[in-house]
Design a protein with these regions (language model features):
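A short glycine-rich, Lys/Arg-flanked "PGG" loop and its adjoining helix->strand segment in the class I
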Residues: 67-82
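Short, glycine-/aromatic-enriched active-site segment of Class I SAM-dependent methyltransferases
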Residues: 89-109
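Hydrophobic beta-strand segment of the Class I
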Residues: 54-55
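Helix-to-beta-strand junctions that scaffold the AdoMet/dcAdoMet cofactor pocket
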Residues: 4, 62-64, 77-79
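Core SAM-dependent methyltransferase catalytic element
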Residues: 125-128, 135-136, 141-164
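Class I SAM-dependent methyltransferase SAM/SAH-binding core
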Residues: 1-44, 68
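Short conserved loop adjoining the S-adenosyl-L-methionine
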Residues: 43-48, 64
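Short alpha-helix
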Residues: 110-132
Length: 164
């Protein structure tokens, strides 16, 4: 609905189960300008320069190859296209032991990247106008549930960037 009657939405997921669920939801709401494709965020099944906006909600941190994710996002975006993501990040680095403990708590948290490394990977892919905003309230709520950690801090971020 947000893209209007002339817009088109492509959803990508790596699992057939999530694609089937997405198709059921699409049928339930009666929209026909949405299509779903099976693929990985490191190798999107989308043509070069064919996308205006990429939205990602707590997925990039799950990838072990974040630079590849950002290169791929840059590849499929048109010039002037925007990437908007919500993701878990850290300020500082967790030790391998802390990451293992976090992984036991929630796999998505253990994949959180240091904000400086995350931004640098975006820059290296070619993105500009990169903004990272700490969504403090959710992070504070989450922090009380996480295992104790050293000097690193986990936070939930809203990230935006532009392909020029």
């Amino acid at each position: 609905r947000q893209v209007g009657p002339g817009g088109h939405v492509i959803g990508v997921d790596m699992t057939p189960a999530m694609l089937a669920k997405a198709e059921r939801n699409k049928a339930r709401v009666g929209l026909d300008n949405i299509e779903f494709r099976q693929g990985f965020i490191e190798a999107l099944p989308v043509a070069d320069g064919s996308v205006d906006v990429i939205l990602s909600n707590c997925v990039i941190n799950l990838s072990p190859d974040k630079p590849a994710v950002f290169r791929e996002a840059y590849r499929v975006l048109r010039p002037g296209g925007r990437l908007a993501a919500s993701d878990m990040m850290t300020i500082g680095l967790f030790s391998p032991e802390e990451r293992a403990d976090l992984s036991a708590w929630a796999g998505c948290v253990s994949g959180a990247e240091d904000v400086a490394d995350y931004v640098e990977a975006m820059r290296a892919a070619g993105f500009e106008d990169i903004s990272v905003v700490d969504k403090a309230a959710p992070a504070e709520e989450l922090a009380g549930q996480l295992p104790e950690t050293g000097p690193a801090r986990l936070f939930s971020a809203r990230v935006t960037a532009v392909r020029r």
